[in-house]
UniProtKB/Swiss-Prot annotation:
Record's keyword terms, sorted: Activator, Early protein, Phosphoprotein, Transcription, Transcription regulation
Induction: Expressed in the early phase of the viral replicative cycle.
Biological role: Acts with RNA polymerase to initiate transcription from intermediate gene promoters.
Sequence similarity: Belongs to the orthopoxvirus OPG150 family.
Originating organism: Vaccinia virus (strain Copenhagen)
Keyword Phosphoprotein: yes
Taxonomic classification: Viruses, Varidnaviria, Bamfordvirae, Nucleocytoviricota, Pokkesviricetes
Subunit structure: Heterodimerizes with protein A8 to form the virus intermediate transcription factor (VITF)-3.
Protein name per UniProt: Intermediate transcription factor 3 large subunit
Domain of life: Viruses
UniProt-listed InterPro entries: Poxvirus_intermed-TF
Length: 382
């Protein structure tokens, strides 16, 4: 981890990170993080009864548990704004909301109606789909006009699905769904699977998302603010997430180790100089501290922050290159999966930029109208 941050610091005058996803590999000695969090979230409907430590309440916006049988969101109401009457309601026509109408539940309903949550994304996506029933096409081919085509409504306790079809092409279906949601206190519950993955999610107020899988491996999607400047800000954001995440684990799992790690993490946060932060991270790696010793890069992107004032020559890019140009002048390096990958493509990017500058200078010095076609091809296509 320290070597990665050292290199990102070396290039931060030219490149800035955009997407940054990473994993914390599960460790047997830590215990069943997924199982214990699942048990706590499943059995409670108040945020305070899940997250006891009030010192970290400001950092956590929502907890989500999703498996085949149940999807449950627990929201931290204090992290949401007070809505006025003109606040847009995003999802009423997709959901039947059942609530006990208490003050706490009513506030949760208000938030749910206005927030673009994963439930809203799921139901909107499934409503948009037009589906071709290939089985019914086969019936048409082999069975003629007597083939049976399904349209109508099918539903269970929590999900109503309406299937419509065109009389001229009855095998093409338009599918609309409406979901029942039960809201009690801080909890938003629906039955059945509403995601591809079975995970627990912790959504932070800074938009970072931590996904915990069944084996307690974690996938962390680190958010980025517009005012993030350089590697030191990135380290602070990552270790801020670590600090609050590990105190949450200590809260739920009752493992003092996480409190100890949170204290070590806090030293990185309070250090003011980048060199000191990197030194502390290196020491954590040497002592096999959780969060550093089991850190693994998932994927990250870099963007070239300087302006490209010369002509861009796309022909210099390999077909499978991770260097991409967007909107003609925006150079990004995408889907980097290791420090070695990063160093390799930054080097290629630097060399390519120099070659483009040279070609651009030559191109600007010649008369395009009188220059030979072969010479122009050599400049533009090779």
């Amino acid at each position: 981890m320290d070597n990665l941050f050292t290199f990102l610091h070396e290039i931060e005058d030219r490149y800035a990170r955009t997407i940054f996803n990473f994993h914390l590999i599960s460790c047997d000695e830590i215990g069943d993080i997924y199982g214990l969090m699942k048990e706590r979230i499943s059995s409670e409907d108040m945020f305070d009864n899940i997250v006891y430590n009030k010192d970290i309440h400001h950092a956590i916006k929502k907890l989500v548990y999703c498996d085949i049988q149940l999807t449950k969101h627990i929201i931290n109401q204090n992290t949401y704004p007070v809505f006025n009457d003109s606040s847009q309601v995003k999802c009423c026509h997709y959901f039947d909301i059942n609530s006990d109408n208490s003050n706490i539940s009513s506030r949760t309903v208000e938030i749910f109606e206005r927030e673009k949550s994963s439930l809203v994304s799921y139901i909107k996506t499934t409503n948009k789909k037009r589906k071709v029933n290939y089985g019914e096409i086969k019936k048409t081919v082999h069975g003629g006009t007597n083939a049976n085509y399904f349209s109508g409504k099918k539903s269970d306790e929590y999900l109503s699905t309406t299937v419509r079809s065109n009389i001229n092409q009855p095998w093409i279906k338009t599918i609309s769904k409406r979901m029942r949601v039960d809201i009690i206190n801080h909890s938003i519950v629906t039955r059945g699977k509403s995601s591809i993955l079975q995970t627990i999610e912790i959504i932070f107020t800074n938009r970072t998302c931590v996904k915990i899988f069944k084996d307690s491996t974690m996938h962390i999607i680190l958010s980025k603010d517009k005012d993030e400047k350089g590697c030191i800000h990135m380290i602070d954001k990552l270790f801020y997430v670590y600090y609050n995440l590990f105190l949450l684990f200590e809260d739920i799992i009752q493992n003092e180790y996480f409190k100890e790690v949170a204290n070590v993490v806090n030293h990185v946060l309070t250090a003011t100089a980048l060199d000191e932060k990197l030194f502390l991270i290196k020491k954590m790696a040497e002592h096999d501290v959780y969060g550093v010793s089991n850190f693994k890069i998932g994927m990250f992107n870099l963007t070239f922050i300087k302006s490209l004032d010369h002509t861009v020559f796309p022909s210099l890019l390999d077909e499978d290159s991770k260097i991409k140009f967007f909107k003609g002048k925006k150079l990004n390096i995408v889907a980097l999966r290791s420090l070695e990958d990063c160093i390799n493509y930054v080097t290629k990017s630097e060399n390519m930029i120099e070659m483009m500058k040279e070609r651009s200078t030559i191109l600007n010095s010649i008369d395009i109208e009188t220059e030979s076609v072969d010479r122009l091809k050599e400049l533009l296509l090779k």
